[in-house]
A protein has these predicted regions:
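Long, compositionally biased stretches
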Residues: 1-69, 86-89, 93-95
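Short alpha-helix capping/helix-loop boundary micro-motifs
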Residues: 36-37, 75-80
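Beta-strand/loop nucleic-acid-binding surfaces
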Residues: 72
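Conserved GTPase G-domain substructure that encodes guanine base recognition and part of the catalytic core
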Residues: 98
C-alpha cells in the first residue's frame, strides 16, 4: 500500500472545553494525501501514523476535522519532553504506520 511521509510546521492548539487535549492541524495538502489513501475504514475515519516532534517519536492516529483537514493529537508526555504547549509552532514529521 502506498504511504505518506511528510514534514510540516503547525501551531499547537487546545481543544475548546477540554484543557487536556492539544492538537496540531495538518496542512490541507498533507490532509488531502491522507484522505486519498486506499485503506479499510477505521474508527472515525482515522489513519494510523508514526510521528516525530523534536527528539520524540510515537505512534498514534490522525482524525478528520470536517472535510478539509486532519488533526493530530499531541500527548502531554511529548509536549513536556519537548518543552512545547498550545500556541507554540512546531516542526512535525509524519508517516503512515504499517
Amino acid at each position: 500500500m502506498p504511504g505518506v511521509q511528510r514534514e510540516f510546521t503547525a501551531e499547537l492548539w487546545r481543544a475548546a472545553g477540554d484543557a487536556a487535549w492539544v492538537f496540531a492541524r495538518l496542512p490541507e495538502d498533507v490532509s488531502a494525501e491522507f484522505r486519498d489513501l486506499p485503506r479499510p475504514p477505521a474508527g472515525f475515519g482515522s489513519v494510523r501514523v508514526t510521528v516525530t516532534l523534536g527528539g520524540s517519536r510515537w505512534s498514534t492516529s490522525v482524525f478528520p476535522e470536517g472535510s478539509s483537514a486532519y488533526v493530530l493529537p499531541v500527548r502531554k508526555a511529548v509536549r513536556t519532553a519537548e518543552g512545547v504547549d498550545a500556541g507554540d509552532v512546531v516542526r512535525i514529521g509524519i508517516e503512515t504506520a504499517g
